[in-house]
Amino acid sequence: MKTKVTIKDIAREAGVSTALVSFVMTNLRGGKTAYRVNKETTAHILRVAKELDYQPNITARNLKYGKSGTIGVIFSDISNPFFSEIARYIEDESWQCGCSIMFGSTDESSEKLGKLVDVFISRGVDGLIIVPCEGPDEIIDSIIARNIPLVLIDRETSGYPGHSVVLNNARTAYELTYRLIAKGCRKIEMLSYTMSLTNIREREDGYRLAMQEAGLADEIIIGRLPHHDTDAHVDSIVKMAVERGADAFLFATNTLAVQGMSAIVRNGYSIPEDFEVACFDRNDAFDIFDVELVYVDQPAKSFAAESMKSISELIAGKVMNRTRIVLEPQIIEAGTFRSRI
């Protein structure tokens, strides 16, 4: 087994003191030292360190400065394509800034969120990026009270005073509804959740506004489904919409879109022949349908980049002018998904 190279080994090989090697390596910034040290001596020490394949003890260095070099990221459901894509990009960002990431999922459970927060804090994370779930705001409030750097993404808690990265949900839902109206649809029903999450409520607001401005206020209908038992209710919601003469559906999430379109097909209807469909987010499950729909491509890469930038600056103690970053999506119209089966 290869023996780990230490600072003493470098000092002995370079013919300098251990203190000088420690000083150079500790204050290294992008190949240069933060303080004035003879350039030739610095270059010599770094060359020897490279030849010996020296690997710094990141944990020890972080402990010295009170940092773990780890950021905790908590999603509502990391298996959701949108969140898993963000997770992938966050990993890429973490490599760029030289930190490690701990991931967790709450399954929309505030109890699980609380436990994950406690675990991550006990592990010494430097900061947290969280998709908050429905429930008491005490968990988020406690993080703020403990002065732990925090960034919320995708959604916020009521009255949250801190940093966040969110989508322009109301404007996006307005635009989706407007696209359906432009196709000639008048009885557009929205399928949403019973949860009082800020992003869901904002999407409902955007739908309402578009319908009202089009003179369709009397046609506004929002069917709300429980998050954990959607399949048991979606068929009845779709059937009632059909009985009311609905000609289009706006789905608040990609999961609802898959479940809703499945119910439409199960009941013998076609998209877009019988119903136009619009939804938030792309989902690979769309590939099993032979449909055309309007959907939102949320900027997962921007969510990752902006949240990592914000949390890194908070950890570094920088004063940030922007606390709430609102992202704009790309709307894909008439995207066609052909069946693979």
Where are each of the predicted segments found?
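N-terminal helix-turn-helix DNA-binding module of bacterial transcription factors
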Residues: 1-66, 338
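Alpha-helical recognition/docking segments in bacterial nutrient-uptake
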Residues: 1-2, 6, 65-178, 182, ...
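Hydrophobic beta-strand scaffold residues
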Residues: 18, 101, 150-151, 218, ...
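Conserved hydrophobic residues forming the short capping helix/wall of the S-adenosyl-L-methionine
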Residues: 49, 94, 210-211, 264, ...
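Flexible loop/turn connectors
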Residues: 165, 169, 219, 231, ...
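An alpha-beta-alpha
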Residues: 176-216, 323-338
